[in-house]
A protein has these predicted regions:
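Short, compact, well-ordered microdomains
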Residues: 114-136
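Active-site-proximal loop/helix of nucleotide/amide-processing enzymes and allied scaffolds
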Residues: 20, 33-34, 114-117, 151
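N-terminal, charge-rich interaction modules
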Residues: 5-83, 87, 182-186
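Short, intrinsically disordered low-complexity segments
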Residues: 69-111
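Short proline/glycine- and acidic-rich turn/helix-capping motifs at secondary-structure junctions
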Residues: 135-149
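A generic structural motif
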Residues: 82-86, 131-138
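A recognition module on extended beta-rich or small alphabeta surfaces enriched in W/G with H and D/E
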Residues: 153-186
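Short, surface-exposed beta-edge/turn micro-motifs
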Residues: 28-31, 101-105, 128-131
Length: 186
């Protein structure tokens, strides 16, 4: 077997085991998907929380700094954090809607902290996210929770997105090590 083929097989196995590990976390703990990224990280017009003002004209650099700060906050709370690739429509159903691909974070409540969902909601507000994806233990009944003043889903509003479906692609999806997963109605 060539080295290239060996590496391809290893990477495929790594991708599958990473998706399996994600599924295992979903079965055993409450989980969430969140990011510090914003389409325009300097625009705080829809924010509800007091947060340091992001300044500058390099959005990618600002977003990377925001995600690093978010990772630090999540780890300090004792949560498991895995980098994933997210894809969704920011400002959904508005004139300013646009597809955004961003570095997102899959967060597992490894210590079953009873304040996990509230902590994720607070971090969503702090980082001025339109919403966070909250996933109850078992991977069923996941929902978006609005965490800023965007029209969709709206501050404090819940939008049911369904249950975990590994290996499937959709308009709104997440990838871990290149393997997609979605939440959808069954």
């Amino acid at each position: 077997m060539s080295m290239k083929k060996l590496l391809e097989n290893f990477n495929k196995h790594l991708s599958e085991s990473s998706l399996s590990r994600t599924h295992q976390h979903l079965m055993e703990h409450d989980c969430a998907i969140i990011t510090g990224y914003r389409g325009d990280p300097t625009d705080s017009s829809k924010c509800v929380a007091d947060r340091r003002k992001d300044v500058g004209n390099d959005a990618l650099k600002i977003n990377k700094e925001r995600n690093a700060e978010l990772i630090s906050n999540l780890r300090s709370l004792g949560y498991g954090v895995t980098s994933v690739a997210g894809s969704y429509v920011e400002d959904f159903m508005q004139d300013t809607a646009k597809e955004v691909k961003e570095a997102s974070l899959f967060v597992a409540n490894l210590n079953d902290d009873p304040s996990f969902l509230a902590q994720i909601e607070n971090l969503g507000q702090y980082f001025c996210q339109d919403s966070v994806l909250l996933i109850p233990q078992g991977g069923q009944g996941a929902y978006l929770l609005g965490t800023n003043n965007s029209e969709f889903p709206g501050l404090g509003q819940k939008i049911d997105v369904g249950s975990f479906a590994g290996g499937e692609e959709a308009e709104f999806m997440t990838r871990v090590k290149g393997r997609p997963f979605v939440f959808k109605e069954k």
